[in-house]
Amino acid sequence: MSPSTLHQGAAKGFADAATYDAYRPSYSSEATQKFLSHLRLADVPHARVLDLAAGTGKMTEVLAARHEGFEIVAVEPHEGMRAELEKKELPGVEVKDGFAAKLPLGEEWADGAIVAQAFHWFATPEALKEIHRVLKPTAVLGVIWNIEEYNKPQHWEASTPWENALNELVFSLGSDGQPRFRNFVWKDVFDNQLDSNPLRAVRDVIMEGGRKMPLFSVPVGEEKVPFTVWLTPEALWNRLRTLSQIAVLEGDAASAFKEKFDAIVAGESVERNEKGEVLLHGVTYLAWTSRL
């Protein structure tokens, strides 16, 4: 799938933009501050920020509410999501249609670029080249995801047996050929910038008579910020079904998945409070890399 066209899985899986906006979580002040510090944007007045694949504006809202007074261009190709974002009329935010490989910005416009909850959809050399074009020299590209444990990569350890079971249920859907954060292949686009191991010293590579050099620094920086949240089983289900691979389930497949979900959430290892809410664990995953 070209990064200059809307991925079919995203177009269908996120068709209900209002539900996505209602049930997807925002970003904590702790995670946001750490993230912006890594991007060298924290406390920088009026910095120009590209919010790429802004969706319904979960991250855009957080950025617009901060004290820096960022000048934000929020780029989103999904018409329904972009409409939800435009309704919010956020201060300092200009909303534009566009794709990762064809950004509606001039060269070296941005002091920093942010991709929240979406980089796995367009982790391609073409997208990196275009992001590199619009960033100022040495500016930082940051990618961020809220990852509940049901959506984590399988090599990450779960906090509880029931969350591990829910994670296994999500993985039982198998691969539909669509890119997912939990498959953890999005990092390859950075590591594969060179034909040799990116952790070794950069070597010359003969490529059409020139040097093939990386566009962004490697290895990427990484940090996890843990979080917990109490949710009713219904709210947990509503959040879970905002995942595109679950949102597209229909008929018997949807019913069978929901039955398995209900059985897991009714399990003995689930911690509940007096309101009947269950305790859900997750991390906000941060990664960043500098434009070279």
Where are these regions (language model features)?
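Class I SAM-dependent methyltransferase Rossmann-like catalytic core
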Residues: A10-Y27
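Conserved alpha-helix/loop element of class I SAM-dependent methyltransferases that forms part
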Residues: P25-H46
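Class I SAM-dependent methyltransferase SAM/SAH-binding core
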Residues: R48-K102
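A short acidic, Gly/Pro-enriched loop at the edge of an enzyme's catalytic core
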Residues: A101-G112
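A short SAM/SAH-binding and catalytic strip from SAM-dependent methyltransferases
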Residues: D111-P125
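A short glycine-rich, Lys/Arg-flanked "PGG" loop and its adjoining helix->strand segment in the class I
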Residues: E126-P137
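Conserved catalytic/acceptor-binding region of the Class I
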Residues: P137-V229
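Conserved Class I S-adenosyl-L-methionine
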Residues: Q193-L292
